[in-house]
Curated annotation (Swiss-Prot):
InterPro entries: Ribosomal_uS2 (IPR001865), Ribosomal_uS2_bac/mit/plastid (IPR005706), Ribosomal_uS2_CS (IPR018130), Ribosomal_uS2_flav_dom_sf (IPR023591). The keyword Transcription regulation does not apply. It comes from Aliivibrio salmonicida (strain LFI1238) (Vibrio salmonicida (strain LFI1238)). Keywords: Ribonucleoprotein, Ribosomal protein. It comes from the Bacteria. SUPFAM superfamilies: Ribosomal protein S2. This is Small ribosomal subunit protein uS2. One of its GO terms (molecular function) is structural constituent of ribosome. The lineage of its organism: Bacteria, Pseudomonadati, Pseudomonadota, Gammaproteobacteria, Vibrionales. PANTHER family: 30S RIBOSOMAL PROTEIN S2 PROKARYOTIC AND ORGANELLAR, SMALL RIBOSOMAL SUBUNIT PROTEIN US2M. Belongs to the universal ribosomal protein uS2 family.
Amino acid sequence: MATVSMRDMLKAGVHFGHQTRYWNPKMKPFIFGARNKVHIINLEKTVPMFNEALAELAKIGNKKGKVLFVGTKRAASEAVKEAAINSDQYYVNNRWLGGMLTNFKTVRQSIKRLKEYEVQAQDGTFEQITKKEALMRTRSMEKLEKSLGGIKNMNGLPDALFVIDADHEHIAVKEANNLGIPVFAVVDTNSNPDGVDYIIPGNDDAIRAIQLYLNAAADSVKSGRNQDVAAAVAEKDGFVEAE
């Protein structure tokens, strides 16, 4: 299972919060102090909290659970997609569509349409219809791919959300809360930690910090799954130790 040290966090700038005038008082327990009117996050709190979150993600991976990585702002978008793909999970990195979780039935219909367009693009259907119609379908397919491409193979609601910037993704957090889906989230000094089950107090803007969170989370989910695979192989080969 992945773990992250204080040195790793310092190098990535996890400890730099937002300007003091933008703070959310609910983040006070996680703030060490201020320097040049910028809040400094207490990494002595962040390190154990993040490692606890990673241990839980490994358990979800071990149970073959589904983790949905969410980060739609520019600094997080590409890293969110990479983390999800690397861990064979799911992502939303463009725009959170209202009802993506709470109205998943309707979202499923859009995913079905996306998959139909993908088949048509491959099987020659687009060549048999008018150029105008083919162009309209291509544009519709690209738009759907942008919004839903990261969840088109999710087949049901996720078992957890891993969110970069709880404040920016507050709609996703609220939908998960309504459905009882656990939320793991990076929460900066300007954000509200309410509704987050596993709070990771930290910088949610620096690309290096974002990559640190996502790489560790993806590695934890993967290691949980691999443990399960290793156990299955050992059992098959007769190497299970007697208790």
